[in-house]
C-alpha cells in the first residue's frame, strides 16, 4: 500500500509541476474581466444666450492726405550677354567626356567591316543627341584625335561618317585638326 501512496504522490507532484509550468509559460497580463458597458446619456444642448454687445462710440478719424511724389523711372540697363562667335576648328571644349564616345567605335567598325544589317548607332547618337552640330563635331573630333575609338582612320572622313549616321551635319568650314 505504501508503494501505491508513493506512486500517487509522485503523480500528484508531476501533474502539479506540469500545471504550474504551463500556467507560467502562458502568463497573460490581460484584463479578463469585461468592462461594464455604460450607456451614454443623451446630451442636452445648453442654451446659448447672446452676449450683450456694447456699442463703441464712433469717432471719425481725420483723413490726412499723403503727398505723392512721383519717383523718376530710371531705365535699367538690360545688357545682352555677348557670346563670342565660335571659330571653325576644334578649338572648343567638348561638354561630354571623350572616353564615353568609345561606343562610337562600334558604329565605325560596323560600317567598315562587311556585316549584314545596319550597325547599332543608338548608343553613339544618344550621347551627342542634345548637342548642336558644332559641339557634336568637336566632341567626335576630340575622340578621333585622341584615338579613343581605337581605330586608325582618316579623321575628316570618319567624322563626317559618324555625324551622318546620327543625322547630323558637319558645319561648314569646320576642320578637325
UniProtKB/Swiss-Prot annotation:
Pfam families: Hydrophob_seed (PF14547). It is found in: Secreted, Cell wall. Residues 37-87 have a biased composition (Pro residues). InterPro entries: Bifun_inhib/LTP/seed_sf (IPR036312), Bifunc_inhib/LTP/seed_store (IPR016140), Hydrophob_seed_dom (IPR027923), Plant_LTP/defense-related (IPR051636). Transmembrane segments: none annotated. Induction: Transient slight accumulation in response to a brief exposures to cold. Probable lipid transfer protein (LTP). May improve freezing survival. This is pEARLI1-like lipid transfer protein 3. The lineage of its organism: Eukaryota, Viridiplantae, Streptophyta, Embryophyta, Tracheophyta.
Amino acid at each position: 500500500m505504501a508503494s501505491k501512496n508513493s506512486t500517487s504522490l509522485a503523480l500528484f507532484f508531476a501533474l502539479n509541476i506540469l500545471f504550474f509550468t504551463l500556467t507560467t509559460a502562458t502568463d497573460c497580463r490581460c484584463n479578463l474581466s469585461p468592462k461594464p458597458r455604460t450607456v451614454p446619456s443623451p446630451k442636452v444642448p445648453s442654451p446659448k444666450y447672446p452676449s450683450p454687445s456694447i456699442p463703441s462710440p464712433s469717432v471719425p478719424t481725420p483723413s490726412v492726405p499723403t503727398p505723392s511724389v512721383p519717383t523718376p523711372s530710371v531705365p535699367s540697363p538690360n545688357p545682352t550677354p555677348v557670346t563670342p562667335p565660335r571659330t571653325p576648328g576644334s578649338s572648343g571644349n567638348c561638354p561630354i567626356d571623350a572616353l564615353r564616345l568609345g561606343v562610337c567605335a562600334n558604329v565605325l567598325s560596323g560600317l567598315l567591316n562587311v556585316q549584314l544589317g545596319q550597325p547599332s548607332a543608338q548608343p553613339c547618337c544618344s550621347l551627342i543627341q542634345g548637342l548642336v552640330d558644332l559641339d557634336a563635331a568637336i566632341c567626335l573630333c576630340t575622340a578621333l584625335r585622341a584615338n579613343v575609338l581605337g581605330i586608325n582612320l582618316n579623321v575628316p572622313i570618319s567624322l563626317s561618317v559618324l555625324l551622318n549616321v546620327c543625322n547630323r551635319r558637319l558645319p561648314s568650314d569646320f576642320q578637325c585638326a
